[in-house]
Regions:
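Short, acidic, Ser/Thr-enriched surface-loop or helix-capping motifs
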Residues: 3
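Active-site beta-loop-alpha junctions of metal-dependent nucleic acid enzymes
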Residues: 12-35
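Residue-level signal for inorganic ion chemistry
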Residues: 24, 46, 118
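Generic alpha-helical structural context detector
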Residues: 29, 93, 116-120
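Helix-centered, glycine/charged polyanion-binding patches within enzymatic domains
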Residues: 37-108
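C-terminal domain-tail junction helix/linker
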Residues: 112-133
């Protein structure tokens, strides 16, 4: 889970055969940065999370679930519309820069999770440097 600028907020490690929607609750619970008091947290999700709105709202967030292609149509209709989900794809590409992570050679989830957390910390540091100079 990342914020609007691509800074990681939570990380959940699972097998490749687990669907993302089954990990939604764990990802929301694992957030390391909470929203400021009085500010509603918005969560943008893709079509794979249809039916998970209640799980998001029970954790105090507002779900925004768009079917595939609807975001692109909205960009054509409204030139001021800003896409949101591409930030997650950029974050994945930043993680892929750390060649130790792909392919996975670590035997335990603990060691692989530690390397992922280190990579997330490096991405966060780079984003802070870019944003704040």
């Amino acid at each position: 889970m990342v914020d609007g600028r691509g800074v990681p907020l939570s990380l959940v490690v699972s097998g490749a055969n687990a669907h993302d929607s089954t990990l939604l609750g764990r990802a929301l619970d694992a957030r390391v940065v909470a929203a400021p008091k009085g500010v509603e947290q918005n969560v943008c999700l893709d079509a794979g999370f249809v039916g998970k709105e209640e799980e998001v709202t029970t954790r105090g967030c507002i779900p925004h679930i768009r079917p595939r292609g609807e975001e692109a149509l909205e960009m054509v209709r409204n030139p001021d519309f800003k896409a949101r989900r591409w930030v997650v794809e950029c974050f994945h590409s930043w993680l892929n820069r750390y060649r130790k992570l792909i392919p996975r050679y670590e035997k335990t989830d603990l060691s692989h999770g530690g390397l992922l957390k280190l990579a997330c910390a490096m991405v966060t540091l780079n984003k802070v440097i870019v944003i704040y100079g």
